[in-house]
Amino acid sequence: MLNVKTHISNDEKTMNFGVAFPNDYNDLPLIIYLHGAGERGKNFEHVYRHGIPKLIKEGKEFNAIILFPQCPAQFIWNNMVKELKEIIDFVIKEYKIKKDRVVLTGSSMGGYGTWETAMCYPELFAGIAPVAGGGVVWRCGKLKNLPVIAYHGDKDFTVPISQSECMVESTKNFGGNAELNVISGYGHNDGIDYAYRNTNLIERLISFRKTNFEHVPEVCEELF
């Protein structure tokens, strides 16, 4: 089943979002998918171009509830973290999702958004899978209690694989559990589709359960 709704945030930003779920969705995890820059706007059909929504459009079903919001055209996910959190909170309540089974993934701009959202709300997620993304390396300490499985094509010239390499290495240096899965011979869009279609990325996300909900301070919080 699929529901498409519109959310108006507390600061009056409008965002469309889809929720795909099986008939019996009791006790299932929530997977949040953040799309890339080319799928922004108000035409929700654009969201189905890549990643998990593309698989949903093709008829694939998952043993999970899938939330896939659409970023407004004038923003990027890194600017929409608070608004995204409002939608996640709504879906968790609406579908009675257990808070230890919420996971996050995204590709390209959504890969960056995955890193950023997880660093803003690490206590919210049981695990993350950024695909062809990157972020702010000095903030990776926020992820030390969160499993990270990153994916990136080694022929990606849109977002170089070095972006994922730096984030994974920084997370590990802070004591986190992070790994980079290199998609050999693949570029940007084809690498993204390969990660979701031909690897066990989704199955691994479904297997994650959160056990540590403690607050992790920013580096600057520890200094003052």
Language-model features and meaning:
Residues H46-V47, P160-S170:
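Short alpha-helix in the alpha/beta-hydrolase fold that links the catalytic acid
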Residues G153, I183-D190:
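Histidine-bearing beta->alpha loop at or near hydrolase active sites
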Residues L104-G106, V131, Y151:
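Short beta-strand immediately N-terminal to the catalytic nucleophile in serine-hydrolase-like folds
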Residues I149-H152, D156:
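Short beta-strand/loop motif that positions the catalytic acidic residue
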Residues N26, P72-M109:
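Gly/Ser-rich "nucleophile elbow"/oxyanion-hole loop immediately N-terminal to the catalytic nucleophile
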Residues L30, L34-E83:
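Active-site machinery of serine-nucleophile hydrolases
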Residues E123-G134:
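A conserved short beta-strand
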